[in-house]
Amino acid sequence: MDLKQIEKLMIAMGRNKMKRIAIKRDGFELELERDTGPNIQEPVFYDNRLFAGFTQERPIPSDQNLGNPIVKEVGEKKEDKPVEGDFIVSPLVGTFYGAPSPESPAFVKPGDIVSEDTVVCIVEAMKVMNEVKAGMAGRVEEVLITNGDPVQFGSKLFRIVKA
């Protein structure tokens, strides 16, 4: 095997993303190993249906606007009224379900009175259904998330006015 053949073999290794090759033929041995740099995890791809309910707060500028400033008109700022009540938050990352099954009625709805031990929803994490209890007594004022939406640890699920 001459130098040209070895160079072609190295190019083929790069094209095919091979890390190592060993050749033994007629008393000739050749072993090539590529240093691929640090071990970087492959990108993770998510099913877009999981994020269908999310909206993007700020638009991503297109290639045409990269050199130009983005001008945004600002109207009158509305006074934010303080929100009355406390919040029930998600104790873990998962998927929010407001009912035990699709055919069942919701655990709670606005206007319902709950105690500390009342189950208000289920958060599914890794195929395990975890019941979320109110943790406080009061009246449900608002359901802040839609059935089937993903939730993060600490996401606000319900607004409660303590009794």
Swiss-Prot record:
Residues that bear N6-biotinyllysine: K127
InterPro entries, per database record: AcCoA_biotinCC, Biotin_BS, Biotin_Carboxyl_Carrier/Decarb, Biotin_lipoyl, Single_hybrid_motif
PROSITE patterns xref list: BIOTIN, BIOTINYL_LIPOYL
One BP annotation, GO: fatty acid biosynthetic process
Record keywords, A-Z: Biotin, Fatty acid biosynthesis, Fatty acid metabolism, Lipid biosynthesis, Lipid metabolism
Gene Ontology terms, MF aspect: acetyl-CoA carboxylase activity
Domain of life: Bacteria
Pfam families given in the database record: Biotin_lipoyl
GO cellular component terms attached to this protein's record: acetyl-CoA carboxylase complex
Domain Biotinyl-binding: 85-161
Pathway field: Lipid metabolism; fatty acid biosynthesis
Signal peptide: none
Known role: This protein is a component of the acetyl coenzyme A carboxylase complex; first, biotin carboxylase catalyzes the carboxylation of the carrier protein and then the transcarboxylase transfers the carboxyl group to form malonyl-CoA.
NCBIfam families: BCCP
Assembly description: Homodimer.
Protein's recorded name: Biotin carboxyl carrier protein of acetyl-CoA carboxylase
Protein's organism: Chlamydia muridarum (strain MoPn / Nigg)
